[in-house]
Amino acid sequence: MRRIAVLGLVVAVLFSTVAPAAAASTPSGGPGASYAFVHDPSMIREGSTYYVFSTGDPAGVVGRGNIQIRTSGNLRTWRYVGTVFPRIPPWILRLVGPIPNLWAPDISYFDGLYHLYYAGSSFGSNTSVIALATNVTLDLSSPRYHWVDRGAVVSSGPGDDYNAIDPALVRGPSSTWLAFGSFWGGIKLVAIDPATGKPDTTHPRVLSLASTAAPDAEEGSYITSHDGYFYLFVSTGFCCRGIASTYQVVVGRSRSITGPYVDAYGTPMEQGGGTELLGADQGMIGPGSGSVYHAGSTYLFDYHYYDAYDGGAARLQIRHLYWTSSGWPVTGPPLVPVPGSPAGGG
């Protein structure tokens, strides 16, 4: 465990200099943007519309590097509708240096607001920050639609044993937490004050949930609950290498949000455990960085993979999650068709 040193001061200084963010930018990237570069997706539904938020395109072709938004009414056909911000917030550039894109958003709804956590990071280092933006609605046509930049949540740098990327909020019966992390110590967990969306100063410790030595270090974590257990999904291996990516998704479970999490064989995830949920299959290379959409008895796992039939392009995919008699998740067939891929690809 590790305490968040001087984070409250950093957050206060940054937030005091941040103006409210503008509405989503005008879609760019042409007609193919709806399927181009979907990485690190996070899905939610408002009304009859599903929304997927995903990492900004580092090439700037789609959305100029900002968090992308796509919508669907049926989970199969998706339309790119713009970005959360018109540009990367200047305070992030001042904190982590020049970066081409924002990473790995996580969208949730509580206390009357949509909370979007996301990261800015210098690739290959742990000079990173997790930030928060809020909105009262996701309906881009609503006059109430407006993203407010709430500033920094967790930051990291040389000397820290964690990397402040890949945020994922989880709410328990009486507490709220944020999972995050990657290389530099694996998956961490910090208590969140739901009134602010920021770390709870009465519980300032950073807890450790999962750790494996490179090259199979975990990142892209997500926690959901089912039938008395909390399930921790993580991606192991390497992302971001197209068809050379080695990502796969593994899972462990615990009776408590804070762990310890173990796999189906009882191996602790802090000791490299994890039961495989998804691996490479035909044209689907490096599946990972997934999140779980949960509504009633429905569980959907949304993730990205690299399309071997299209030069390793990053694609969105969604599958139903089902549960075995022993309480472990398994995935159903893919829901999202990808142009140019054989039937069932993804």
What are these regions (language model features)?
Residues 1-24:
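Secretory targeting and sorting signals
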Residues 24-346:
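Carbohydrate-active catalytic/glycan-binding domains of CAZyme proteins
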